[in-house]
């Protein structure tokens, strides 16, 4: 417990909280251009080929972001919308690409959780 005199001399230090998605700069989403679209393998207990893209954002940051859902139409120079949110089993992937926005199409034939994958409501038969 410091004395009043010690507090007057030094004051309290405020703990700095580091952002989990610094490239967003406090924005909910950012637009960017794909510089590389590729697959990568997850950390130890899991096994798959996860689809990721390296994206150059409008603020100059270059980030690796995850492409969720089954199948995609992304290639180099595609314009995408990036949101925060990491992928636990892919080190260095701290962002997601928003499906159904800009150049990235929604997931085809998706029936459940459609809003997360940019899928339109299916037509009644």
From Swiss-Prot:
Keywords: Methylation, Ribonucleoprotein, Ribosomal protein, RNA-binding, rRNA-binding, tRNA-binding. One of its GO terms (cellular component) is small ribosomal subunit. Residues 106-125 are annotated as: Disordered. CDD domains: Ribosomal_S12. Residues 113-125 have a biased composition (Basic residues). Pfam families: Ribosom_S12_S23. Belongs to the universal ribosomal protein uS12 family. This is Small ribosomal subunit protein uS12. It comes from Variovorax paradoxus (strain S110). The lineage of its organism: Bacteria, Pseudomonadati, Pseudomonadota, Betaproteobacteria, Burkholderiales. The gene is rpsL.
């Amino acid at each position: 417990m410091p004395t009043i005199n010690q507090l007057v001399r030094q004051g309290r230090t405020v703990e700095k909280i580091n952002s989990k998605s610094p490239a967003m700069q406090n924005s909910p989403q950012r637009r960017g251009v794909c510089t590389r679209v590729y697959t990568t393998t997850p950390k130890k207990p899991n096994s798959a080929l996860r689809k990721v893209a390296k994206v150059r954002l409008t603020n100059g940051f270059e980030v690796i972001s995850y492409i969720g859902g089954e199948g995609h139409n992304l290639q180099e120079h595609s314009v995408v919308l990036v949101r925060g949110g990491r992928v636990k089993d892919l080190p260095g992937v701290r962002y997601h690409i928003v499906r159904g926005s800009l150049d990235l199409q929604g997931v085809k034939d998706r029936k459940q959780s459609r809003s997360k994958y940019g899928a339109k409501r299916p037509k009644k038969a």
